[in-house]
Each structure stands twice: as C-alpha cells, then as structure tokens.
Amino acid sequence: MMAFENTSKRPPQDFVAPIDQKKRKVQFSDSTGLVTLQPEEIKDEVFSAAMYSRFVKSALDDLDKNDSTQIGIIANQVALPSKNPERINDKNLNILLDILSSNINRIESSRGTFLIQSIINFEKWWELPPHTLSKYIYFIKILCSSIPKWWQDVSMILVSCFILPIKQTVCHHDMLKYFLRMIPSSMGFIDTYLAKFFPNKNDTRRKLVNYTSNLLKLRGYCSELGFQIWSLLIEKIISIDVELQNELDELDDDVDDDDLEEVDLEDDDDLDDDSGDDDDENCGNSNEELRSGAADGSQSDSEDMDIIEGMDGTEEYNVELTQGIKELSTKLDSILTLVSTHVEEQVTPESLESGEGVGVFNTLTTLFKTHVLPTYYTRSIQYIMFHVSQQQLELMDSFLVTLIDISFAVNEAAEKKIKSLQYLGSYIARAKKLSRTQIIFVASYLTSWLNRYVIEREEEVDQRGGMERFKHFYAAFQALCYIFCFRHNIFRDTDGNWECELDKFFQRMVISKFNPLKFCNENVMLMFARIAQQESVAYCFSIIENNNNERLRGIIGKADSDKKENSAQANTTSSSWSLATRQQFIDLQSYFPYDPLFLKNYKILMKEYYIEWSEASGEYESDGSDD
C-alpha cells in the first residue's frame, strides 16, 4: 500500500502537467491489433507519474531533515522479491532512478544506505525492460563514481551473479569493464570475490560451467587479473579431478578404464537441481550453448552414464560411488572442454605474433609447474597443456624444454624429477603433432644422460645402500622405453640404421648392473621387450625370466659367489629395497599422465592431438593393457 503525504494544501498544478484538452487518441501496435488509450487513461497515467515524482522528492526533502520514514517506504518497496505484486513497477522505478541520479549527494548519509542497498540488490535487475535497465545502469555508474565506496558492494554483487549464463551477464561485464578502468585499484578485492563466489565442486554443473564461462570473459577484458583467474580455474579443476580419482580408487577393481571409456553421457534432470528456480534465487537461470561438445549450461547440468559393467547394483555403497563418479565426471568434462576450447582460440599464430598468446601459454606453463606437476595422480587436468602446446611447433618445443629442465635440474626434489620424466615420456608417446626432429632430440638427450649415468655410477651398485638410490635412472630409462614402444617406427634413418644407436644403447643398458628390467614398471618392460626383440634392438626375455626366478626363490638382489663374503653382504644390502620405498616407487612408475581419457566430450576434442596405442602398436596389444 503506497503511502503519500497530505497534499490537500497544494494546488493541482503541482501534480499534473498541463494537458491539452483536445480529444486525442494514442494507438500502439500490438500483435492482435491496435490498443487504444482514451484521453482519460492518459490523464491518469500522467497524474500517477507526477504524484510519484512528487512523493520521491518529498521523501528526499524529509531525508534532508533527518526523517527517513518515506525513504524507508520506498526502499522497502524496491527490496521486495520480483514475484511480489507490491514491488515497485517499472514506470515508478524509472522516476525513482531519474530523481536519485540527479540527487545522489542527498542519499549519501547513513539514512539513505537502506535505499541504496535495496537498489543495488534489486532482484533480477538484468531482466528489466531496456529503457529501465539503461536508467538502472546509469544510476549505478553515478552512484559509484560519486561515492566510490559503493563500488565494492556493487562489484561483489556482480561477481556473485557469475553463476548466470553468459547471455544474462552482458550488463554485469559492461559495468565491471567500466569500473575496472575507472578504479583500477579495485582489482584487489575483486580478485578476492572471484575465489569467494566460485561454486563448490559439489554444486551443480550448470553453475560451475557458467561461472567458468564468466571468468574467461572477464579475463578477456582485464588482463591484469589473467593470472589470478587462470590460477583459480586450475585449482578448482584439480580439486574435482583429484576427488574423481579418489572415488575411482575406492571402487578398486569393480570398475576399470574400459568401462569408463564406454560410458554414454546423456542429459538427466534427476542428477541436477530439483528446481529450475535455484539459480533465480542466486542470480538467475537462463540458457547458454557451450561450444565444441561442452554441455549446455542451461540444460539439466548432469549427464547420465550407462550402467558400468560389472557393478553390483544391489550394493548401496557402489551405487553411491557410481553416482558420485557420474556427477564429477560430467562436471570435469564440461569445464575442461570449455577451458581448452577457449585456450585454443587464444593461442593462434596471430596472437602469438602479437605476444598475447605467448602470455597465455606462459601462464599455463607456470601453473603446470606450480599446481599440476606437484599434484599426484591427476587424470585429466594435464590435458590442458597437452592440448595448448600442440597448437604450434614452438609451443611444443617450449613444453619439452620445461619438462627436460625439471627432470634433470640439480635442485629439484627426486619425486618431482621422476614425475616430470613420466610426463616427458607420456607426452612424447601420445602427442600426435610432434615432429620427428623433436622426438629424436628428446631420445638423444635421454640416451646421452643414461650413458653418462651408467659410466659414472655403475660401480655404486656394489656399495652399501638400497637400489632406490638410482630411481632417477630407472625413471629416465622407463620414459625412453615407453617412448620406444609408441614411436619405434620413426627411430630408423633413411639407411635403416637406428637413430642414437639405440640397438647398442639398449643392449648395454639391460645388461648393466642397474638391471632396469627388474626395477622399472613390469608392464612397460614386457611390452618393450616384445617390441625390442621384434625390431632386433635388444633381447630381454632371458634377463626378465632370471629376475622372475629370483623373485620366486625369495632372493632379493644378486649374490656373486666369486666375491668375498663381505662383498657378497654388501651386494645383498645394495640390492635390497625396503617394502615401503619400493611400493612408493612402483606407484610413481605406474603413473602415466596421458593415459586415455574417459571424459566423453573432452576425449572427442583431444582426438586429433592424441595417439591411441592401437595406432602405434599395430599387431601388439590394445590400449587397455599398454600401461
């Protein structure tokens, strides 16, 4: 119920603008015909507008006298939910915004705070009619320009609405862009808001995808926040990736990679919000089409999977885990597809020439080193670098140099070196865009380092200490063998000779005292032995058989009967490997960063950049058993 002051003492002309008494008929086009407003209706409308204008001005006059009663009435009406019929209508809102924009200093006091807050928190303001929306945005600009302290509140509201689809946040970004240029110092607290309002990993896929889309759009016009935005995205994706891997590990042998690769993702409303109004209450809900197979941010944001074969549907524990895997995988799939598609658009020959693309790549490389590489057993996040590096030959060179530098840096921790070598071997094996020159270069680097290592340290094998002392050597040798399994066809020169003299090199390595066939990943060594024998590079099966016999007899290490007793004791000690240390190394050796993806849309996006085992092995084995 609108309250008005007593206006009986004021003459009518104070309220009503002079109206031409000539009978006029105003017509508006309508889809069903013409809508006619009679002169009396026009008079009522003008009279109503004039009365409301007078009421607002009177409320401001009272506010100047420290009476905020009428301002409070207006603020309460503005603060009502959008579905409440008592909320201020668009015409009166136009009047209010016009008057306040011209009298912004009159509501600067604490008594005007509630009115300002009710306006900046106006529910679904982005859905206002264009004319009213322009007045609303103008008021916000006047407010924050005249009273800068309000920009912090406004920017927080704008960022909190990033859960809306990108089509609904056009005005949000326009205002952010405007004020980031006007008040560049505000980037500090906006950076905080970006992290604060990022949806939880257990939130809906729609919100996660929409928020990611809006962050990427913000990065497009605010390069100063670029690193913070990429860092935030990488952290959140890693969080989902790791949780997904943990849930997969909990299933143990109930589900394998083949099952996950065969899943079919379909829209399923049951896995999404129970109500479509959820986003409306938290800034809105609308439609948005994501590119390149990314899931539609406005549709039900959980895609169903086919029932995983081998699962016992009667076990509630497994059913819950399967449901969690479905939800996490669809979220991860959508976000990664969106991010990689965006990155591909940013790293073009033109952008690299201008330097902008180089900046994006360098940022992602830095975050790979600081966030991705130290995180154990991520399954999908690393494909961002896998994809972006293959956009240009120079970027692949840069990524390879990064991995080599980390793998053999003196000051790096041993675990990080081994992890980097795993990435190096997996990347060379799987990256389809790599040139032969790049592959031969890496192989040459590895063979040179391994040869030098054997020459310098082979005698240490007979000294006291466990074989874990040489895990760096084993990681490098395994990486090279893994590369050879995938790329053996390109290691012959035009005369049929082996590049890097691989035939001599491998034979020397496998018979060295380090016995790499025993301490490297068993599956990789078996496949290497099979291919090496087929290609007449090295003969390993007799050594592998001898190693297996030693294990069966419970003999750890080797014993040389020709040596003295104290030397034999040293050998036994040197060949021993504590169970915990060995298991840790085995786990690390068994990690292949670029194993096949099971995220449906993301796997499709990676297809032209990725070498399947079936493409490289020919007659050997399927991709399911290469690792």
UniProtKB/Swiss-Prot annotation:
Q: Which InterPro entries match?
A: RNA_pol_I_trans_ini_fac_RRN3
Keyword Transcription regulation belongs to the record: yes
Keyword Ribonucleoprotein (UniProt): no
Q: What does the record give under GO molecular function?
A: rDNA binding; RNA polymerase I core binding; RNA polymerase I general transcription initiation factor activity; RNA polymerase I general transcription initiation factor binding
Q: Where in the cell is it found?
A: Nucleus
The region called Disordered is annotated at: 263-305
Organism in which the protein naturally occurs:
Saccharomyces cerevisiae (strain ATCC 204508 / S288c) (Baker's yeast)
Acidic residues biased stretches: 263-282
TM stretches of this protein: none
**What quaternary structure, including any partners, is listed in this protein's UniProt entry?**
Monomer. Interacts with NOP53.
State the protein's purpose: Required for efficient transcription initiation by RNA polymerase I. Interacts with Pol I in the absence of template DNA and stimulates recruitment of Pol I, but does not remain as part of stable preinitiation complex.
**Protein name as annotated:** RNA polymerase I-specific transcription initiation factor RRN3
Keyword list, A-Z = Nucleus, Transcription, Transcription regulation
Matching entries from PANTHER family are given as:
RNA POLYMERASE I-SPECIFIC TRANSCRIPTION INITIATION FACTOR RRN3-RELATED, TRANSCRIPTION INITIATION FACTOR IA RRN3
GO cellular component assignments: nucleolus; nucleus
Q: Which family does it belong to?
A: Belongs to the RRN3 family.
Q: Name one GO biological process term.
A: transcription initiation at RNA polymerase I promoter
More info: Present with 138 molecules/cell in log phase SD medium.
What's the superkingdom here? Eukaryota
